[in-house]
């Protein structure tokens, strides 16, 4: 009998007044009993709308059926037919706008907790199964993947499963891309990411760190070395600023730098080589998940007050509703319909405040959201000693500048065939944030999966 409860099983989590002082994971995950109960809520619809809502096409009702039977490893095997990063996706994928949005149970009540079940299954496997996956039979072909973020790891995993010798070239000293430098420990523990990468290595994927493609080696040199195709999944790590007065003051960070120092360099630990000055009042400019991450990190680093400053209303916030809710629970203050006009400094060049102007919403712009318009005479000053800019990122131009014939958008995104990921260069594919600009982990994974299929077809057609 299906569980006809209108509500999901609640996810156990740390209390807000405890978690905003530590970097331990906020959500604690389902117990076996909760997972079994939640799985019984699935109606196993014949047309499976949830699958259509998943960018990587996980067979969702099938894995949930296995959970309901108590066959958690069987569920894991179904998920990993389509996804190389289930423990990651179960934590950071915006299921509420994808698979769960399509769930029929959501018509009346809450949808099935698909993401929570995916996380449970992946965590159960990691805790209970020690057997390494079998290496596929080598097919004699090799592929280079640039970047070890979600698109690169997905592309590498899918190709490795087909027998390709895959080498991943990562610019940083640690593999994982945005999963390790961009997403905080309390949302995505780094040991979870490492386990996913270890699983890919067990399939035969070779991960080389401290390899900046475009400097150490070029794409043309990789092709000359015998790689039959190259996938560019180098992300979008170049921060954007507002170009307002005061952005060069001490105490102004890009969210990219701030989060990298915290997440990858462990700036919150005593003796860190890349510390962050502890601020009392922090303003984070932006309204996406990155802004929420930066604000919540600042709170954990000891800031007395942390503000989100966003030029539209709460309805237009691009961040996940769950992340906004968590930020509010942890004491983050939202200054909505406000926009910075300049950052103020003291005589020593340190941030002492941020001047803002109030906004109101006008007609919709090209994004479909109502355009924010300044309210004349509404200027005010926010008393802060640190400002973090979280208003987006762009791809690094290094690969473009060292790869002849690689076409890009004016803003730097690589131009690709959307159905294959093929760039303007034969045998060179791209996906993820390097193509779209900053987007979600699961969309980057979908692009990596699409490119892996196209790369396989391309190489096999030449064999």
Named regions from a protein language model:
Residues 141-167, 291-299:
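N-terminal Rossmann-like FAD-binding beta1-loop-alpha1 element of flavoenzymes
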Residues 142-146, 194-244, 342-351, 355, ...:
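Feature captures the FAD/FMN-dependent oxidoreductase FAD-binding
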Residues 248-279, 364-438:
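FAD-site-proximal beta/loop scaffold in flavoenzymes
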Residues 40-62, 84-107:
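Local cysteine-cluster metal-coordination motifs and their immediate loop/turn environment
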Residues 434-462:
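A conserved FAD-binding loop/helix module that cradles the flavin
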Residues 121-137, 195-215, 239-301, 409-419, ...:
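Glycine-rich dinucleotide-binding loop and its adjacent helix/turn
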Residues 168, 172-207, 295-342, 463:
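Rossmann-like dinucleotide-binding cores of NAD(P)H-dependent redox enzymes
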Residues 19-37, 59-91, 108-135, 262-263, ...:
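Ferredoxin-type iron-sulfur electron-transfer modules in oxidoreductases and energy-metabolism complexes
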């Amino acid at each position: 009998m299906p569980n006809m409860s209108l509500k999901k099983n609640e996810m156990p989590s740390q209390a807000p007044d405890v978690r905003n002082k530590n970097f331990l994971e906020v959500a604690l995950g389902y117990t076996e009993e909760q997972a079994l109960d939640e799985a019984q809520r699935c109606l196993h619809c014949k047309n499976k709308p949830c699958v259509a809502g998943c960018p990587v096409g996980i067979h969702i009702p099938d894995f949930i059926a296995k959970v309901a039977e108590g066959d958690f490893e069987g569920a894991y095997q179904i998920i990993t037919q389509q996804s190389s990063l289930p423990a990651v996706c179960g934590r950071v994928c915006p299921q509420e706008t994808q698979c769960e949005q399509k769930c029929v149970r959501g018509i009346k009540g809450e949808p099935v907790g698909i993401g929570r079940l995916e996380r449970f299954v992946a965590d159960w496997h990691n805790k209970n199964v020690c057997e390494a996956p079998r290496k596929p039979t080598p097919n004699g072909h090799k592929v280079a993947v640039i970047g070890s973020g979600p698109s690169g790891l997905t592309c590498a995993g899918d190709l490795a499963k087909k027998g390709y010798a895959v080498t991943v070239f990562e610019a940083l000293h640690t593999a994982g891309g945005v999963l390790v430098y961009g997403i905080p420990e309390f949302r995505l523990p780094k040991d979870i990411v490492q386990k996913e990468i270890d699983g890919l290595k067990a399939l035969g994927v070779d991960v080389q760190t401290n390899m900046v493609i475009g400097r150490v080696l070029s794409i043309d040199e990789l092709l000359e070395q015998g790689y039959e195709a190259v996938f560019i999944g180098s992300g979008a790590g170049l921060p954007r600023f507002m170009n307002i007065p005061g952005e060069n003051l001490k105490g102004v960070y890009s969210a990219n730098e701030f989060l990298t120092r915290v997440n990858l360099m462990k700036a919150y630990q005593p003796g860190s080589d890349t510390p962050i000055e502890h601020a009392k009042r922090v303003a984070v400019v932006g309204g996406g998940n990155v802004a929420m991450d930066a604000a919540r990190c600042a709170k954990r680093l000891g800031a007395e007050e942390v503000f989100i400053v966003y030029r539209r209303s709460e309805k237009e916030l691009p961040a996940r509703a769950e992340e906004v809710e968590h930020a509010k629970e942890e004491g983050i203050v939202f200054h909505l319909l406000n926009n910075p006009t300049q950052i103020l400094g003291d005589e020593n060049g340190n941030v002492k405040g941020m001047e803002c102007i109030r906004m109101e919403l006008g007609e919709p712009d090209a994004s479909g959201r109502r355009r924010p318009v300044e309210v004349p005479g509404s200027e005010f000053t926010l008393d802060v000693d640190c400002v973090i800019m979280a208003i987006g990122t762009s791809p690094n131009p290094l690969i473009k500048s060292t790869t002849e014939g690689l076409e890009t958008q004016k803003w730097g995104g690589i131009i690709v065939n959307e159905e294959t990921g093929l760039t303007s260069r034969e045998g060179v594919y791209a996906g993820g944030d390097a193509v779209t600009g900053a987007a979600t982990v699961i969309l980057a994974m979908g692009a990596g999966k699409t490119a892996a299929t196209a790369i396989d077809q391309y190489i096999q057609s030449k064999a």
